[in-house]
């Protein structure tokens, strides 16, 4: 028994090391790749100081943090709702952030600065999260709370569609591109959004014990003495914050939170002591690679990264759906 535990521990360490190396390679490639390839030896040249340190580095850090946040949010939601198909957009938080952004553009008549739009997007996400917490305080089952999130997402999506469809504002039409996800406008001015993700990411990665209990199911978690109501509220709020900040930073990006945790579980990373940091590393790597594809796929334009993740993630989602039906 002890030998099996040690073998599993060594395997988990190998996985984390491999994912760390993959993330570092993706980070290095992201800094080098672009319209002009800049090798590490040229990073401190005048050209490198402009393209690498002022343009590519803030974008790369944003992609890394958003990918980690979305993947960890997916792992938390899948444990919280006991559903392998749960993902960050499922609770309607992403669409809530979109509604907040559209409301800011309408009320500000396109004159608000980018940081104000970001705050409004976070506020929209947190409002949806507070509504979900109201449902959670009624001690609803996870399935009903999940359905409440789906309903809120549909309502927010309808509000965004109505606002954009009847708008003559160029800014609102450009929001459709923003909602498809993209890091094209990210620079050091958005560093406060990046910093807002780091404390919550680190905190959730340290909560493996309650996450392991939640993964056993509500009844088992209660029997083990876990204050279920408290942890459900805290985790929903933390997920809402991470998704809201991610949407404010890069728009709506799907499938990272769905695919990454499930693939890692299939690889044997079921213990949240390993799964949570593994999701952070794998999510960051996957989104970095998707961002590189979005930048290089077209010569004269940049693909929305949400299109890339949807193209790669949709077949996996269908496979998971068919597997769940069995």
From Swiss-Prot:
Topology within the bilayer: Multi-pass membrane protein
A GO BP annotation: cobalamin transport
Pfam families: FecCD
Membrane spanning stretches: 15-35, 61-81, 88-108, 112-132, 146-166, 184-204, 240-260, 274-294, 302-322
Cellular component GO terms held in the UniProt record: plasma membrane
Presence of keyword Membrane: yes
InterPro entries registered for this protein in UniProt: ABC_BtuC-like (IPR037294), ABC_transptr_BtuC (IPR023691), ABC_transptr_permease_BtuC (IPR000522)
Listed PANTHER family: FERRIC ENTEROBACTIN TRANSPORT SYSTEM PERMEASE PROTEIN, VITAMIN B12 IMPORT SYSTEM PERMEASE PROTEIN BTUC
Role summary: Part of the ABC transporter complex BtuCDF involved in vitamin B12 import. Involved in the translocation of the substrate across the membrane.
The protein's name: Vitamin B12 import system permease protein BtuC
Organism: Escherichia coli (strain 55989 / EAEC)
Record gene name: btuC
């Amino acid at each position: 028994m002890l030998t099996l535990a040690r073998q599993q521990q060594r395997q988990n360490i190998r996985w984390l090391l491999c994912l760390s190396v993959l993330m570092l390679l993706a980070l290095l490639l992201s800094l080098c790749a672009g319209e002009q390839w800049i090798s590490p030896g040229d990073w401190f040249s005048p050209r490198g100081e402009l393209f690498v340190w002022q343009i590519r580095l803030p974008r790369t850090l944003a992609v890394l943090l958003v990918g980690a946040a979305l993947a960890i949010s997916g792992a938390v939601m899948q444990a919280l709702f006991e559903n392998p198909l749960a993902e960050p957009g499922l609770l309607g938080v992403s669409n809530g952030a979109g509604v907040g952004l559209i409301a800011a553009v309408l009320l500000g008549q396109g004159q608000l600065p980018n940081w104000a739009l970001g705050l409004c997007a976070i506020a929209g996400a947190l409002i949806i999260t507070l509504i979900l917490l109201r449902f959670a305080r009624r001690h609803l089952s996870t399935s009903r709370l999940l359905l409440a999130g789906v309903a809120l997402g549909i309502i927010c999506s309808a509000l965004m569609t109505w606002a954009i469809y009847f708008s003559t504002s160029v800014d609102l039409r450009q929001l459709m591109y923003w909602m498809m996800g993209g890091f094209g406008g990210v620079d050091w001015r958005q560093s406060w959004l990046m910093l807002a993700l780091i404390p919550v990411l680190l905190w959730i990665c340290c909560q493996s014990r309650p996450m392991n209990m939640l993964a056993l199911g509500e009844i088992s978690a209660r029997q083990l003495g876990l204050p279920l109501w408290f942890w459900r509220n805290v985790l929903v709020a933390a997920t809402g914050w991470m998704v809201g900040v991610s949407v404010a930073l890069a728009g709506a990006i799907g499938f990272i939170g769905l695919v990454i945790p499930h693939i890692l579980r299939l690889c044997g990373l079921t213990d949240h002591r390993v799964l949570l940091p593994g999701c952070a590393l794998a999510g960051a790597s996957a989104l970095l690679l998707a961002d590189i594809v979005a930048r290089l796929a077209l010569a004269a334009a940049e693909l929305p990264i949400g299109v890339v993740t949807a193209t790669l993630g949709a077949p996996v989602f269908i496979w998971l759906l068919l597997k769940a039906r069995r």
